Amino acid sequence: MRRLLWLVAVLATLFPSLAAAQELSLSLGEGGSISARTIQLILLITILSLAPGLAIMVTCFPFLITVLAILRQGIGLQQSPPNMLIVSLAMFLTYFIMEPVFTEAWTTGIRPMIDETVGVELALQIAIQPFRSFMAARLDPNTFHAMAALRPGGDAIALAPDAPLSILMPSFMLSEIARAFQIGFLIFLPFLIIDLVVAAVLMSMGMMMVPPATVSLPFKLAFFVIADGWSLIAGALVRSYMT
């Protein structure tokens, strides 16, 4: 109770105009009360805390982070680039790819809600529509129908942007991860060939006690740098969403 009252006091200090407004109050017993606006603020904070997870589910972030993680493992580096750098790169590439979708959602839904020309519920429905179209265009039909079949009566649900989000979102994530594994296989192949060549050379020289991964690592790094691997992979990932 004390923590709740302390939170209300802090919010009243930060938002004096809201605190001074006449609003509906709810009695908590023992002389405590909490306003409806405070409840709205608490709900807003809760939604904001879930925003990163929502961003992962409806954007290309799962695909990008999976491919980059497979790339690092294929080279043979365990901690370099560090996880924070990999995640940051995936986030900025996500922003680059998703910027048209973000702009459309802001223009058609969020901005009118801020200008109070449409209601909150309608604005959210309009804002989520660009993400629905993005997910519907990327997901695998077989995955979608397999997920829909798990729901009672879901066989009649068609693959469309207006499909239920409870089916559209997991189908999109599974499709993105499967596509990332396919690309990861292609990325892994040249590094696997280098490992096999180095292992064969070491065996022919009788150096069976030398770990092939240790010897092949400099060659894989040199191959990746000479081929300008980061630019090639980043460009290929971005272009895969432009088609």
What are these regions (language model features)?
Residues 1-21:
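N-terminal secretory/membrane targeting signals
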Residues 20-243:
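Hydrophobic alpha-helical segments and their helix-loop boundaries in membrane
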